[in-house]
């Protein structure tokens, strides 16, 4: 039984309308991740940088399931891991390391970060080949997908620079032997990209289970007549 104060409500008087709207969107994204079955108990994280000059971002409270996340119980922290608001919750340190690595750069393109440990995502992350361009979803990541070598649980701050270096200017990354990660300018942007990456991995695992992976058509480069790849949300 979960004895954490799920119904905790943050003091709205200290929160701007812009931040509150961001909280609502991020909490909704947590519910969608739960709806699609992408959760791994209480692990994995979706975070969003709070608008303003301070390096603050929102993260899920440690110990709550995704279907328990609300706009009020999201935790606001800085890139050093300090909790900003008065809250009874703690945060997951490994999640802090991964997400603060991206938020500390303060890129307008990477305001939102989403990271999952799905079965299919981890299966693809554990292969030497990585993601193969065999579907309309995975082809949208052709030459647009980063990879990060596995260093064990992300508990040490010095990994942050290597995470940033691995991501580069890409908007999606496979953490080898670990899981999936997407970034975006907005919550919907990052979520749509995550959906495409998750579907890509599901299709690849299904093709492998059917014994047809070796006969799949591998996409190589866009045709001058086909601009589909540039229009896919995951590649924008």
Mark where each language-model region is:
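A contiguous pocket-lining binding segment that forms or flanks enzyme active sites
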Residues: 145-198, 205
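Glycine/small-residue-rich hydrophobic helix-like segments
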Residues: 192-221
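Flexible, glycine/proline-enriched loop segments at strand-loop-helix junctions
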Residues: 16-20, 85-93, 146-154
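Generic N-terminal amphipathic, Lys/Arg-enriched alpha-helix
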Residues: 2-16
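An anion-binding catalytic pocket shared by soluble metabolic enzymes
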Residues: 22-114, 121-132, 138-139
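Class I SAM-dependent methyltransferase SAM-binding "motif I" and its flanking Rossmann-like core
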Residues: 119-161
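Generic structural signal for well-ordered, non-membrane alpha-helical segments
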Residues: 19-26, 41, 91, 95, ...
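Conserved small/polar residues in nucleotide/adenosyl-binding loops
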Residues: 219-228, 236
